[in-house]
């Protein structure tokens, strides 16, 4: 039934709507003075039965209710990245998400479950080993430079010459490290 103004005061059942989404939030009785309309954010049209996981949303233009999926407050996971997505709006879930959370690092979605992505883990470990190797090479070069200066100027002490040889040997051994075997690397000991 559509609301019609009246010359008489009356009390009618109304269905309250949440401003912004027009979703049903409850019902109650409203006193309607003569020659006035319904209170803001309400209708006198009863909502349909609302199944779990849905809300009733009122379309003011059509004067009708629609059932809309409601996953707000829940977390889903992007199947491409594994990133958590918090659902904060009404409507169906975004495409390419799952309710299942990835267990740990280096997981990929196989269409039905998260599985270990050994290739991604291997590449990560290789990049990590390359970064470690580069950092250690920089440390070695920083130690070698002043010692080499002293040797070139023929003012190096016996201890400096010994340290220079140790650091150069370390740098050569470090340079031979094969980072493609990332998890099995035995790093040379610092001098």
UniProtKB/Swiss-Prot annotation:
Xref: InterPro entries: Phage_T4_Gp38_tail_assem, TFA_Chaperone
Top-level lineage group: Bacteria
Pfam families, sorted: Caudo_TAP
TM stretches of this protein: none
Family: Belongs to the tfa family.
Name of the featured protein: Prophage tail fiber assembly protein homolog TfaQ
Organism taxonomic ancestry: Bacteria, Pseudomonadati, Pseudomonadota, Gammaproteobacteria, Enterobacterales
């Amino acid at each position: 039934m559509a609301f019609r103004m009246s010359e008489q005061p009356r009390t009618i059942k109304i269905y309250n709507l949440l401003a912004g989404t027009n979703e049903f939030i409850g019902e109650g009785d409203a006193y309607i003075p003569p020659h006035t309309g319904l209170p803001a954010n309400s209708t006198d049209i009863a909502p349909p039965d609302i199944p779990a996981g849905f809300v009733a949303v009122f379309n003011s233009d059509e004067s009708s209710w629609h059932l809309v999926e409601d996953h707000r407050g829940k977390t889903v996971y992007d199947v491409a990245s594994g990133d958590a997505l918090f659902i904060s709006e009404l409507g169906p879930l975004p495409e390419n998400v799952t309710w299942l959370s990835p267990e740990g690092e280096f997981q990929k979605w196989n269409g039905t479950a998260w599985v270990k992505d050994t290739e991604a883990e291997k590449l990560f470990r290789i990049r990590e080993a390359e970064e470690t190797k580069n950092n250690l090479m920089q440390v070695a070069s920083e130690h070698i430079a002043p010692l080499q200066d002293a040797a070139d100027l023929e003012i190096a002490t016996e201890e400096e010459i010994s340290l220079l040889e140790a650091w150069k040997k370390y740098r050569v051994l470090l340079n031979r490290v094969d980072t493609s075997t990332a998890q099995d690397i035995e790093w040379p000991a610092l001098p």
